[in-house]
Amino acid sequence: MEETPAPRARISEPKLQKKVVKFQTEIEKDVELEAVYEDSLSSGSSLGTVVGFHGSPGSHNDFKYVRNKLDEMGIRFIGINYPGFGNTPGYEGQEHGNPERQNFTNALLDELKIEGKIIFIGHSRGCENALQTAVGMPSHGLVLINPTGFRHHKGIRPVYRLEYLNSLYGILPSFMGNAMMLGIYKAIGFKVQSGEEAINAMRSAMRMSLEDQIEYIEKLNQKNTKKLIIFGGNDHLVEEEIVLEKLEKHDGLEHFRFGDNINEDEKLKIMETFTGNRLGASVFVAKDTHFQNKSQADLVAEACKKMLEA
């Protein structure tokens, strides 16, 4: 008889907060808006804080399974919501490149004045911003879940189709453009609530840094930041070889490959890579999809705890 898997613990509701932030666009235009973010423990944690950067589309809920585990560990989680993705409002003339996204990120984190050890964690598109933030701010750890790479992955190829949709959206009446984008993204299988969210997700995918990430990886290699990079063999958006190219630039990682589940002995070996002077691990799971933020939530949370203890 097959063993019935234990039911997953009930996920608690996110604790959303609001804070007015001021930052500049890429053309140095001043923006002031009310940022909406998740803060699971606003009083702080003596263990440390994990800051999450969502995908496109995405939100703080990208990390709800990880955060639920962090709650049990007493580790604070802050989930950033980028403007225009359904929580933090967008603004006129918004660009979606990393310079502008980082200005927003830095403005919010400066307002929050987080004390103690910090781990930055990204999912998919958000991995670029997690990386840049880990370089620009004091960082104890970095976790990249299903990261994008240095070239366009299959989820956004061919790029000319995205450029065509972006141009078409710009000339259509807003109600028609939004209906078009909402229909396309829902048909693909993305969870979006509006056409505005869909077009912003697409534009942010079009404005990724790609190979320009290399300079940030090289800078991070000069620090003693612990790292975990996880990716899956059944990822329908990002090819394995694209992530492997990225891994070549990260110094000091120990590499693990699994076909299916990771047993406790194997998990302990991964955790050991975050101890002492060791810098961390990359973990490939052949059966996993693009959503290891759910399937490997326990591994990610345990890795964060181990990093904070180091």
Predicted regions and their residues:
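Catalytic active-site module of serine/aspartate enzymes centered on a nucleophile-bearing elbow/loop
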Residues: 254-310
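Active-site loop/oxyanion-hole signature of alpha/beta-hydrolase fold enzymes
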Residues: 82-118
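Short beta-strand/loop motif that positions the catalytic acidic residue
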Residues: 223, 229-231, 235
